[in-house]
């Protein structure tokens, strides 16, 4: 008994020393990561982890469901496609045609009310809020210097040249390592840290703004901090969640409240982690498909939506050597595919796919994705989307 007691005391000491070491080395965020993810048996964040985070509520108002297409679920999905959905633990598959639900399927215990994590699809939603804030005059435009609302960078010579447009297009030059699986990566600290603003505002810019495109969750989070401060200064909103609720969620008559992860300071994690259901994600896709308009009301300025789905380049959204053809303002593009499409994309294969030529939106939510897909290899994801989801959707309307 004495031996067992000694072992337990030793283990407790090791745990305490380990925890103390994490805090002393500035890695206290790892405690949250261990509790919320690793002890749950996951190697990375998962689509149901809102249950382990503090959240802000995006309030819905009047609730109007999407109408069902006259051919709703009349044509079965192909056996190969169903196998693909099951292979990666798909939660929801929704196909919209002409604003109506054509095909709707829930798998692996999920249903039409299940709230799951958007991951980086939230980046595109945050960009919509930027467009609205510019239209309302809270932000002067995409050329506004970031130091106007991020004065912590006023002594950084490169940051002095950066604009809010650079953050939205991800060519700001902010130093960053986008890595979801390394426990000590800055991206993991951004997700699990207690104060994301303090963490990011201690960073620096290492490349001339506008000269180099690099996918970066930090850029979107800095954009969110910028928008939040602008809204608070003008008195337009007390938080980004409040602004999203009043400017998008309620006008679109979403069917349920949404949940947005927040840090210890109640700052929304705008680079990720907006939790809602498949039908609400579909409405966001339809909003973009309709140039920012919903039921005759202009929600997001049409010219801003056009910039969102135009290749990264000059500030007006035209293509240039300074940015890729496959990314716009916080939106992924496939202008070289037939049919052309653009999409919201999130970790583990969260997609809202928009196909303007066919007036279709496809939503796929799920627990895993094909491991061969990598945003750093820009052809892999659009190739997969074309050959898998779009192929199946087009078969339904033959």
Mark where each language-model region is:
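Active-site-proximal alpha-helical segments within enzyme catalytic domains
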Residues: 219-228, 270-293, 350-366
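N-terminal leader/targeting segments and the immediately adjacent pre-domain N-terminus
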Residues: 1-111, 139, 194, 384-398
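Active-site-proximal binding-pocket segments
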Residues: 243-310
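Active-site SXXK
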Residues: 99, 117-142, 167, 223-227, ...
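A short acidic/small-residue loop/turn micro-motif
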Residues: 107-111, 115, 368-370
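Active-site helix/loop module of the DD-peptidase/beta-lactamase fold
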Residues: 136-175, 202-204, 232-272
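Solvent-exposed loop and edge beta-strand segments that line ligand/cofactor-binding
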Residues: 156, 208-216, 268-275, 344
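Active-site Gly/Thr loop motif
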Residues: 254-258, 309-361
């Amino acid at each position: 008994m004495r031996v067992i007691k000694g072992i337990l005391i030793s283990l407790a000491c090791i745990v305490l020393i380990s925890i103390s070491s994490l805090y002393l080395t500035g890695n206290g965020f790892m405690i949250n990561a261990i509790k919320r993810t690793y002890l749950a048996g996951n190697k990375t964040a998962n689509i149901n982890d809102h249950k382990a985070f503090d959240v802000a509520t995006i309030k819905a108002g009047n609730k109007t469901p999407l109408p069902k297409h006259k051919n709703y679920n009349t044509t079965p999905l192909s056996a190969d496609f169903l196998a693909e959905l099951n292979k990666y633990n798909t939660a929801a598959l929704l196909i919209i045609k002409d604003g109506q639900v054509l095909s709707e399927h829930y798998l692996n215990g999920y249903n039409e009310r299940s709230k799951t994590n958007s991951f980086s699809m939230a980046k595109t939603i945050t960009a919509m809020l930027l467009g609205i804030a510019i239209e309302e005059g809270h932000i002067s435009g995409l050329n506004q210097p970031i130091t106007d609302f991020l004065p912590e960078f006023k002594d950084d010579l490169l940051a002095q040249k950066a604009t809010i447009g650079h953050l939205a297009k991800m060519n700001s030059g902010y130093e960053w390592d986008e890595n979801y699986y390394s426990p000590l990566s800055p991206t993991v600290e951004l997700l699990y840290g207690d104060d994301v603003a303090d963490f990011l505002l201690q960073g620096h810019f290492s490349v001339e703004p506008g000269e180099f495109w690099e996918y970066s969750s930090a850029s979107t989070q800095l954009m969110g901090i910028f928008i939040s401060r602008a809204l608070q200064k003008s008195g337009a909103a007390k938080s980004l969640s409040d602004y999203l609720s009043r400017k998008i969620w309620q006008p679109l008559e979403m069917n349920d409240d949404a949940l947005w992860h927040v840090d210890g300071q109640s700052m929304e994690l705008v680079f990720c982690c907006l939790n809602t259901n498949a039908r609400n994600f579909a409405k966001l896709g339809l909003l973009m498909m309709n140039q920012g308009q919903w039921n005759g009301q202009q929600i997001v300025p049409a010219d801003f939506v056009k910039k969102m789905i135009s290749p990264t380049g000059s500030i007006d959204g035209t293509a240039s050597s300074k940015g890729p053809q496959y990314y716009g303002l916080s939106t992924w593009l496939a202008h070289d595919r037939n049919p052309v499409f653009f999409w919201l994309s999130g970790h583990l294969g969260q997609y809202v796919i928009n196909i303007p030529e066919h007036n279709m939106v496809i939503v796929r939510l799920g627990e895993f994705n094909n491991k061969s897909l990598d945003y750093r290899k820009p052809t892999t994801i659009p190739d997969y989307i074309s050959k898998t989801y779009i192929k199946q959707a087009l078969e339904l309307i033959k």
